[in-house]
Amino acid sequence: MMTPQVITPQQMQQILQQQVLTPQQLQVLLQQQQALMLQQQLQEFYKKQQEQLQLQLLQQQHAGKQPKEQQQQQQVATQQLAFQQQLLQMQQLQQQHLLTLQRQGLLSIQPGQPTLPLQSLAQGMIPAELQQLWKEVTGSHTADDVVCNNHSTLDLSTTCVSSTAQPKTSLLLNSQASTNGQASVLTLKRESSSHEEYTHNHPLYGHGVCKWPGCETICEDFPSFLKHLNSEHALDDRSTAQCRVQMQVVQQLELQLSKDKERLQAMMSHLHVKSTEPKASPQPLNLVSSATLSKTASEASPQSLPHTPTTPTAPLTPITQGPSVITTTSIHNVGPIRRRYSDKYNIPISSDFAQNQEFYKNAEVRPPFTYASLIRQGILESPEKQLTLNEIYNWFTRQFAYFRRNAATWKNAVRHNLSLHKCFVRVENVKGAVWTVDEMEFQKRRPQKISGSPTLIKNIQTSHAYCSPLSAALQASMAENSLPLYTTASMGNPALNSLANAIREDLNGVMEHTSSNGSDSSPGRSPMQGMHQVHVKEEPLDHDDNDGPLSLVTTANHSPDFDRDRDYEDDPVNDDME
C-alpha cells in the first residue's frame, strides 16, 4: 500500500513564494488534503487496532491472568471498537464530501494517476492569501496534535506519532490508498496562455527589476527573477516583517482613500445642491472685451474697483468717491450675474454647445447663454427650422438638466423672449402656430450692445482672440481656488493678482484711446474726466441664478435703442422665482 506524497518544507515555501494558486484552487486543495490526512490516520489506526486485538487474544490465552486485568482489557477493547465506529462514520462523511466536489467539477479523481507535479500549478495569489494558507495548514497540524493528546488513554500514541511525524510545514498532495483500493489525485487544469500572461504581469516583477519593497534587484529575465525571489525572499522573519509593513501601508492608503472619497462626495453634493444661506458667486469671471470693469452693487452704491497705474504713462484714478473695494457683501446684495460671452460678440453657440452637450444633459448647471440664443439654437437644430412652443419646451428639458427641475419658472421667460424679440417670427401653418428665426434680425441685434466710435468697436472685436484664452485661464484659476472677487484679504492671491493686472492693462488701453479722441476730450481734460466717457452697462439679474457666472461688458456712448434688444428673461415681471 502506497503512502500519500508529502511536500517538504522547502517545497512548501516554493509554492507559497511562486504564488501559483488561485483562492478557489487553494480552498479545494486544503479540503482535499484534510480528507487525505484523515484517511491516512484511519488506515494507520486500523493497523494499530489489528495489532492490539492480536495482542489481546494472545494475552487471554495465558492461564495466569487475573480476572481484574481481563475486565480492564475487555473495557479497553470495547472503547476501541466504539472509537473505530466513529472514525468509520467520519470517513464515510469525507468520502461523500469528495464525491460532491467531484460532481461539481472542482475535483478530478482518476485512478492510477501519478501525483500532481508542482510545475503544473499556475495562478496568482496575493500575500494575504499566502498567510491565510499558511495559518490553515499549521492549524490543521495543531488540531492533529490535540487529537493525539485527547485519545492517549486509548493507546493511540503510535497512530498520532505516525500521523504527525512530518513537520508542520508539510502538505499531502496525493493519496494512493482508499477504502475501495482505488487511488485519487487532485488535478488542476491550466492553459499555457494564462501562464504567459501571469509571467508578464507578476506584481513583484517589472521592467527587469524586483519590486519587493526595498529590494530593486535587477533581474535579466523572469526565471532569474524567480530564482532571486526564492533565494532572497524566502519565508523567514525578515520577509514576514516586510509583509506586515506592507499591510500597514495598504491599510493607511485605504483609509486615506476613503477619506478622500468622502471629501469628494461632500464637494460634489455642495456644488450641486443650492445652499439656503447667501454666498458669493463660485463661477469665474469672464472677460469679453478689452475694456473690462466689474459690476457694481447697485446704481445707488458708491463702491468701485481700485485702480492703480501699471504704467507711468497712463495713470488711473478712482472713478467715484467712497470706498474703493468691492467686498463679498456687495456681491451678496447684487446676486449672481450670468456670463454671456457667446452672445456679446457673435461667438457661435453651436461650437460650445456641441463640446459640452453631454455635460449640460447630466449636470444641473445653468448654460451660459441667453434665452434668445437657446431658443434660436433649438429652432435651428429642428429639421424644418421651426418649432411650436411645446417643442421648444421639450428641447430645453431634453438638452439641459438644469431646466428639468423647475419648468414653471423658466417657461414664462421663454414665452416673454419669443414675444418681444424681433428675431423670432410667429407663423401660422397646418401644425398651428410655429416659431422661426429671422437670422438677419438676430445678427443685427448683437452689435447694438456696443455703439459709438468704430475704432472702439474694432478694437473690442480684434481683442476677442486675446480675451478668449485669457478668460479661459482666469475661469480655471478662479474656479480652482474658489476665489471671491476683490477683497482686501484676497489681494495677495497670485490668481487675483494676474486678474488685476489684466484688468488694469485693459483699462489703460481704454484710457489711451479715450484721451487720443479729440472729439470726446479737450486738452485740459484730466484722465479722470476722460474715464467718464466709458459707461458700464449693467445687465439685469435673474434672481433664480444663485450660481450664475459673472459677465463684465463695457459700452461707450449708450445707444438710445439699446433697451429694445435686451434679454427680457431678466425683467422683474418675468423673474425666475424659485
UniProtKB/Swiss-Prot annotation:
All isoforms show similar spatial expression. Localized to the animal hemisphere of early cleavage stage embryos. At tailbud stages, expressed in regions of the brain, eye and the splanchnic mesodermal layer of the lateral plate mesoderm surrounding the gut. At stage 35, expressed within the lens of the eye, in distinct regions of the head mesenchyme and in the area anterior to the gut. In the brain the anterior-most expression is restricted to the outer region of the mesencephalon. With ongoing development, additional expression is found in the curling gut. It comes from the Eukaryota. Residues 250-271 are annotated as: Leucine-zipper. Residues 366-456 bind DNA. Pfam families: Forkhead (PF00250), FOXP-CC (PF16159). Residues 293-325, 511-578 are annotated as: Disordered. The keyword Repressor applies. Residues 284-288 are annotated as: Ctbp1-binding. It is found in: Nucleus. Keywords: DNA-binding, Metal-binding, Nucleus, Repressor, Transcription, Transcription regulation, Zinc, Zinc-finger. Coiled coil: none annotated. GO terms for molecular function: DNA binding; DNA-binding transcription repressor activity, RNA polymerase II-specific; RNA polymerase II cis-regulatory region sequence-specific DNA binding; transcription corepressor binding; zinc ion binding. GO terms for cellular component: nucleus. A zinc finger (C2H2-type) spans 208-233. The keyword Transport does not apply. Residues 568-578 have a biased composition (Acidic residues). CDD domains: FH_FOXP2. The leucine-zipper is required for dimerization and transcriptional repression. Dimerization is required for DNA-binding. Isoform a, but not isoform b, interacts with ctbp1. This is Forkhead box protein P1. The gene is foxp1.
